């Protein structure tokens, strides 16, 4: 596999994971006590990217709720919908760019094979 194809595929896989992590966070935005995750991209040799997922332990907002036992302080999730939406949009753009890199390299290799025939 050429380095350009490897790089593009690595990007597609990495940004797929970032999108999945943001989707997981958004799906749990209303889950009390949920701690959001962050997908951190790291360089991987040669010319690749790997993803490390970490949990953000920051406390979510606390609200006073009425339960059968009386008033209880409940910690909500620490997910910020605006931040997750922005992360999703950015990851999507990088995902598309990685796909384009694969497409471009595929076309280049096709042209090279045509010349060699």
Question: Model-predicted segments: where are they?
Answer:
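Amphipathic alpha-helical polymerization modules
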Residues: 1-117
């Amino acid at each position: 596999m050429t380095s350009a194809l490897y790089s593009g595929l690595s990007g597609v896989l990495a940004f797929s994971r970032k999108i999945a992590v943001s989707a997981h966070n958004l799906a749990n935005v209303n889950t009390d006590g949920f701690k959001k995750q962050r997908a951190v991209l790291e360089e991987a040799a040669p010319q690749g990217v790997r993803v490390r997922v970490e949990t953000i332990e920051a406390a979510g907002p606390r609200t006073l709720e009425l339960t059968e036992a009386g008033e209880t302080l409940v910690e909500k999730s620490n997910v910020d919908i605006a931040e997750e939406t922005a992360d999703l949009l950015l990851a999507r753009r990088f995902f598309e760019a990685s796909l384009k890199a694969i497409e471009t390299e595929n076309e280049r290799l096709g042209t090279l094979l045509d010349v060699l025939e």
